[in-house]
Amino acid sequence: MATKTSVVDRLRSRIGAASPPISATVEAGHLKRFAEAIGDPNPRWLNEAPPTYLVALVSVSIHLAEAEEYGKGWLNGGNRFEYMEPVMAGDHITATGKIADVYEKTGSSGTLLFIIFETGYVNQHGRTVARVRGTAIRR
């Protein structure tokens, strides 16, 4: 089994490396069902994507086998969404992610591994429509 230090070093070596792009088309029916699922009846969401929709539309996978060796259990440390323009039904969205930072923090329950992700979302016109920055925590 790898040491925690070697796991952190391997993850840090991947900072900035882009994931393979993944694409999907925003469908009006999916927007409606997503709005129903989050309990938001605003008719705006019949044609425009609600704020967290993109994460459900195209989930970027950054393989983190190294982190599995660090410990057990994942925690979601939160996400920050930044929108540059609305995402509408019919838009074709391509997402690419990367590891932005990796660090450890020691607290009362022990040492935790923090992995910061950034994902960019581009529409069919080549314009960046949104960015998401998230934190995954491994115990």
Predicted regions and their residues:
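Hot-dog-fold acyl-thioester-processing enzymes
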Residues: M1-G78
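Aromatic side chains
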Residues: F34, W45, Y53, F81-Y83, ...
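Generic structural detector for well-ordered beta-strands
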Residues: S23-T25, R80-E82, T135-I137
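Mid-chain, well-packed structural core segment of small domains
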Residues: E68-D91, A95
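HotDog/MaoC-like acyl-thioester-processing domains
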Residues: M1-S6, R10, P86-R139
